[in-house]
């Protein structure tokens, strides 16, 4: 039987006392009907110490020397039940939080899919407008690499816009024809004179190059015999080497000092 008894302390935040009545064991020495006191801490916010802001002192651990082994086992079992219930509550709160996160992520995914679909439709409209502008300018519609890749996937994504296409195709065909018209107005006589002048220049250049090669080939064999003859003459008549004059050792030398007996 569990009995809740108020604490003797007049404070509102004092701990409560639970009295657990245990049955007598066969081998235990505890009397029948003995109550097991269990201290349950009260709310800390209602205590005067918590209201004043002073940190509470560490409560000394209560010695259980006055309890029998059965009472100790019952007290340990109660504490284990409280810890298990706390763990279950914490797990339940965590699971509910994860479920809420999953719901939020699914909603965000749906929003992103809708936005992606709108962008695809807008891109398709820009592609159609680009093709119409190309047809108005008299040019064939060009298929980009992005179109080739998206056709395999079944999507119509295309990189670019109508403005870039208009900038690339700004020059019409009339301007191209106006640029080519000066070349068409040149007379054939002028073209013939230009070709003859070019041919004469090339022939003169070829003649000069062959003439310089022939002159260099004629001068080289004539210079070779003279160089070889001069080399042979230097080898046959070398300059004789004269040894330096050495004067005999005598009194005329400044360092003359004979040994005197």
UniProtKB/Swiss-Prot annotation:
Protein name: X-box-binding protein 1
Site location (Cleavage): 190-191
Record GO biological process: adipose tissue development; angiogenesis; apoptotic process; cell differentiation; cellular response to amino acid stimulus; cellular response to fluid shear stress; cellular response to glucose starvation; cellular response to interleukin-4
Subunit annotation: Isoform 1 interacts with HM13. Isoform 1 interacts with RNF139; the interaction induces ubiquitination and degradation of isoform 1. Isoform 1 interacts (via luminal domain) with DERL1; the interaction obviates the need for ectodomain shedding prior HM13/SPP-mediated XBP1 isoform 1 cleavage. Isoform 1 interacts with HDAC3 and AKT1; the interactions occur in endothelial cell (EC) under disturbed flow. Isoform 1 interacts with the oncoprotein FOS. Interacts with SIRT1.
Positions of region (Leucine-zipper): 98-133
Localization, UniProt: Nucleus; Endoplasmic reticulum
Span list, region Nuclear localization signal (NLS): 76-92
Native source organism of the sequence: Bos taurus (Bovine)
GO cellular component terms, A-Z: cytoplasm; endoplasmic reticulum; endoplasmic reticulum membrane; nucleus
Modifications the protein undergoes after translation, according to the UniProt entry: Isoform 1 is ubiquitinated, leading to proteasome-mediated degradation in response to ER stress.
Every bZIP domain range: 70-133
Cytoplasmic side: 1-185
Superkingdom of the source species: Eukaryota
Lumenal topological intervals: 204-261
């Amino acid at each position: 039987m569990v009995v809740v008894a108020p604490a003797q302390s007049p404070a509102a935040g004092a701990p409560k006392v639970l009295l657990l009545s245990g049955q007598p064991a066969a081998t235990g020495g505890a009397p029948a009907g003995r109550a097991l006191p269990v201290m349950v801490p009260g709310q800390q916010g209602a205590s005067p110490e918590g209201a004043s802001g002073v940190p509470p002192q560490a409560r000394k651990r209560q010695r259980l020397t006055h309890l029998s082994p059965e009472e100790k086992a019952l007290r340990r079992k109660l504490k284990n039940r409280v810890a298990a219930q706390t763990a279950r509550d914490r797990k339940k709160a965590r699971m509910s939080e994860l479920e809420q996160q999953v719901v939020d992520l699914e909603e965000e995914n749906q929003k992103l899919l809708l936005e992606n679909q709108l962008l695809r439709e807008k891109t398709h409209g820009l592609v159609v407008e680009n093709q119409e502008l190309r047809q108005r300018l008299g040019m064939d519609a060009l298929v980009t690499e992005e179109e080739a890749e998206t056709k395999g996937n079944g999507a119509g994504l295309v990189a670019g816009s109508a403005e870039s296409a208009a900038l690339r195709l700004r020059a019409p065909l009339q301007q191209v024809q106006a640029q080519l018209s000066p070349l068409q107005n040149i007379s054939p006589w002028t073209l013939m004179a230009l070709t003859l002048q070019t041919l004469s220049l090339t022939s003169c250049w070829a003649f000069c190059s062959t003439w310089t090669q022939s002159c260099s080939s004629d001068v080289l064999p004539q210079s070779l015999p003279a160089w070889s003859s001069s080399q042979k003459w230097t080898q046959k008549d070398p300059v004789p080497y004269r040894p330096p004059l050495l004067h005999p050792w005598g009194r005329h030398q400044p360092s003359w000092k004979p040994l005197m007996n």
